Curated annotation (Swiss-Prot):
Subcellular location: Host cell membrane
Record GO biological process: viral process
Transmembrane segments annotated in the record for this chain: 286-306
Name of protein: Protein OPG049
Signal peptide from the UniProt entry: 1-20
Protein's UniProt keywords contain Chaperone: no
Inducing or repressing factors: Expressed in the early phase of the viral replicative cycle.
Length: 321
């Protein structure tokens, strides 16, 4: 289909008929009724039983945010451009005619998509050393006629992990012929993670050691993405150099600041390992902890000085007596 538009005309009077048509990502779809526009008083358009917009003779109002830039709605047609996977669902137009007749147009849309997210996140970084966590997550996979569960592999030629997809009933949507992520099974069941370390001054002899691939394959279909992880480290090292060159601070202060920055990054990354989706550390809380610690130290010093002074006075008074 490519990006060519496909026009579907369905005429329904006081009846609701549902058909299912599959589209590819970036296709355009037009759902219309043949009813003469001059006979229509107003039309309400729905997506999964939620109102998208209300079209009248004068205007169309009530667009939901995710459709604003890609949808054109009128009394007779619902036009969606550049389909996305999440656009899959049931669309319905209910036209109220001026003579009291109601015309209902309903269409099930299934958008075929293989959504594979392959990302790399730096866990630890110094001027010479870089550790990256590589994560591959499958959020949608079209079976394309396959009768066997798909599998996924993440890694390089020499270092990789393997995972068969779960085949639980709630992971498979029969109408869409697709394994999808979502409740109640955790999304992590369709994700693999692997860590790799890089030395800045190591001579790269085999580029395959830097290229990580995420393979998704089934009986008659395969799909993969590639990511050069060393490039992620190189960009971080370059940023460190730029910061050093741009800074006017003394070298010792630079080193201290970089060490503190590395320590804070390591603490944050360790926290991320426990919960990859947790919020960043609250800066206000961190400042408060530092202030309380400093005040405690100052208080201890004052108490010690006071104790020494009292002791000396007591000793001198004893000598005088």
């Amino acid at each position: 289909m490519g990006t060519n538009g496909v026009r579907v005309f369905v005429i329904l009077y006081l009846l609701a008929v549902c058909g299912c048509i599959e589209y590819d990502v970036d296709d355009n779809v037009h759902i219309c009724t043949h009813t003469n526009v001059s006979h229509i008083n107003h039309t309400s358009w729905y997506y999964n039983d939620k109102v998208i917009a209300l079209a009248t003779e004068d205007k169309t109002s009530g667009y939901i945010s995710s459709f604003i830039k890609r949808v054109n709605i009128s009394l007779t047609c619902l036009n969606i451009s550049s389909l996305r996977y999440e656009d899959s669902g049931t669309y319905k137009g209910v036209s109220h005619l001026k003579d009291g007749v109601i015309v209902t147009t309903t269409m099930n849309i299934s958008v075929k998509a293989n959504i594979v997210d392959l990302t790399g996140r730096v866990r630890y970084l110094t001027r010479n050393y870089c550790e990256v966590k590589i994560r591959c997550e499958i959020t949608s996979f079209a079976l394309n006629g396959s009768t066997t569960p798909p599998h996924m592999i993440l890694g390089t030629v020499d270092k990789w992990k393997y995972l068969p997809f779960p085949t639980d009933d709630y992971r498979y949507v029969g109408e869409l012929k697709r394994y999808i992520s979502g409740n109640p099974y955790p999304t992590e069941s369709l994700a693999l993670e692997i860590s790799s370390t890089f030395n800045r001054f190591t001579i790269v002899k085999n580029l395959n050691d830097d290229e990580f691939s995420c393979y998704l394959f089934s009986q008659n279909y395969s799909f993969h993405k590639m990511l050069n992880v060393r490039n992620i480290c190189e960009s971080k090292w370059k940023a460190l150099n730029n910061n050093d060159n741009a800074s006017s601070m003394p070298a010792s202060h630079n080193n201290l600041a970089n060490d503190l920055s590395s320590m804070m990054s390591q603490l944050q990354n360790d926290n991320d390992d426990n919960n990859d989706y947790s919020a960043p550390m609250n800066v206000d809380n961190l400042i408060m902890i530092v202030l309380i610690t400093m005040l405690s130290i100052i208080l201890v010093i004052i108490v010690v000085i006071a104790a020494i002074s009292i002791y000396k006075r007591s000793k001198y008074r004893h000598i005088d007596n």
